[in-house]
A protein has these predicted regions:
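Lipid-exposed faces of alpha-helical membrane segments in multi-pass integral membrane proteins
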Residues: 9-16, 39, 67-74, 78, ...
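A structural signal for short, hydrophobic/glycine-enriched beta-strand patches
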Residues: 71, 77-243, 247
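Transmembrane alpha-helices and immediately adjacent membrane-cytoplasm interface residues
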Residues: 43-89
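Structural signature of transmembrane alpha-helix termini at the membrane-water interface
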Residues: 16-26, 46, 50, 74-85, ...
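Structural motif marking the loop-to-transmembrane transition
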Residues: 1-5, 57-61, 234-238, 242-245
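Membrane-embedded alpha-helical segments of integral membrane proteins
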Residues: 1-51
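Charged, glycine-interspersed solvent-exposed loop segments at helix/strand-loop junctions
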Residues: 236, 255-258
């Protein structure tokens, strides 16, 4: 009985958390991962009872499930350690350019997670008025306008000069954010081709996302790049961290991080 409760309680927590993420309405289907985790925990909980029937298939399934949990824990542990290396990044002083990575926007303005990025960028820009800010983000299927347009409007309303902000409104993911922003910098400098960027550049995004943003920038040819970490609501951090784990794993397997 105690063993069963130990399994059921975490499964219920995962399912309840998944419902909370669903209710936020982020436009992503990643909340389903929490239901999948809940199902995996329940399966792990009740398989031992089924194994008493001495079915070879049940025993094999039990072993495979344990191996999957070990692999899952190892991947999550390693990636979260990597994410932690940039979790409190403050960026270098006197940056030439700052790239604010796009995130969800709504009809009434940036979503909360996007505001955190913009507010962090604003803090830096107020202290470094010579830094050129690039807001990067295209228009998602659930968004009223390109993210970059609404992000710039927000910064201008907060007092950042419009001429200090460049908009890159075509990107639909982090890799495109980096590549298209790089092309914009090269165009502004009058450089041709796909030259490396020697300027000091900062990547502004939420703390869980900084590591991947910086690594993608280095891979894209930014030689002097640093991260600037913005706040994340702790309640949503488990979902954001787990989703970022998938992003890091995908980009690693695609060769975008090395």
């Amino acid at each position: 009985m105690a063993h069963t409760l130990i399994g059921i309680i975490p499964a219920l927590i995962c399912a309840a958390y998944g419902i909370c993420i669903l209710c936020v309405g982020s436009g992503s289907g990643f909340f389903l991962v929490w239901f999948l985790l809940a199902a995996g925990i329940l399966l792990q909980t009740f398989l031992p009872a089924l194994a008493e029937a001495s079915s070879a298939w049940i025993h094999l399934m039990q072993i495979l499930l344990r191996l999957l949990w070990i692999l899952f824990a190892a991947v999550v542990g390693i990636t979260w350690l990597l994410i932690g290396t940039q979790f409190s990044a403050k960026g270098d002083a006197n940056l030439d350019y700052m790239i604010v990575l796009g995130s969800q926007v709504r009809a009434d303005g940036p979503a909360v997670i996007t505001k955190y990025r913009l507010d962090r960028a604003m803090e830096y820009l107020e202290d470094h008025p010579e830094t050129v800010c690039i807001v990067s983000g295209g228009q998602g299927k659930n968004e009223p306008a390109p993210e970059a347009v609404i992000m710039k409007q927000y910064l201008v309303q907060k007092g950042i000069p419009a001429e200090q902000i460049l908009t890159e409104g075509r990107s639909l993911n982090t890799i495109e954010n980096i590549r298209n922003s790089k092309a914009m910098i090269l165009e502004q400098k009058g450089a041709e081709g796909d030259a490396e960027i020697e300027d000091d550049v900062g990547i502004v995004t939420n703390n869980f996302h900084v590591f991947r943003g910086v690594m993608l920038a280095r891979h894209a040819g930014f030689r002097n790049v640093s991260g600037i970490a913005a706040y994340t609501n702790p309640f949503y951090l488990p979902n954001n961290m787990l989703r970022e784990t998938c992003g890091i794993l995908k980009d690693f397997l695609c060769g975008n991080l090395l």
